[in-house]
Amino acid sequence: GGDMLAGSIHDELIESNEGTNIDHVLDLFDQLVWTISTLADKFEKVFIPTAYGNHSRMYQQYRNKEAAHLSFDWMLYNMLERHFKSNKDTRIRFQIADGFDTYYKIYDTSYLLTHGDRLGVRGGTGIVGMLGPIARGVQKVRSEYANFGKSINYVIMGHYHQYISIKGAIVNGSLKGYDEYAMSNRFAFEIPKQALWFTHPQYGVTFQVPVVAEQGVPKKPKKEWLQWAA
């Protein structure tokens, strides 16, 4: 879903990053080759749809033209695809779009994967927070693709750094967790999470659960595991 690296789109990121964008791409490449190979060993077939994010762009200025070809995310995806193709590993298939979205189907359930920064909406206020913009953006995306003759059951995205599941959309959590940016904007605290769901051949998405991506400090329970009123 993009933003595989923090990037250099802000001066403070350049100052705080450990290494350069190229360093990060090379490190990610090694990590993901192992991860994808391990998944293929366990599941035999692996399909990887991709989308690039806003943090991975090569320029600080936001680009629309040739945006994919100016993205470190997109470069990383292509490096991985070429690696497995050169090793003739037919268990693994990528779908790498040149545009902002990737459309695919699993059985009869249609998905649109996008990073989330190009929903055509802005902001979020009050207690609703980001839910309002996400819901409006999902509706805009669905309407746009309906004009192309494509129906969408689920829009999948990241970008918002919080795990959210609403009707017709799944927003992935963030691996990096809470940071200075989130605190300065008073965003709700959330531990690192990733979205996991199953797609049933007949019923579509039937099971969803957030995967906690942080090993917390073990706590000794102070009370019994179950309590009820006397």
Would you name each region that the model predicts?
Residues 202-230:
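A short C-terminal boundary segment appended to hydrolase-like catalytic domains
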Residues 69-100, 106-213:
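Conserved beta-sheet core of the metallophosphoesterase superfamily
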Residues 45-54, 92-102:
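Acidic carboxylate-rich catalytic motifs and surrounding loops in phosphoryl-/glycosyl-chemistry enzymes
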Residues 34, 74, 197, 225-228:
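A residue-identity detector for tryptophan
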Residues 1-80:
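Core catalytic region of metal-dependent phosphoesterases/phosphodiesterases
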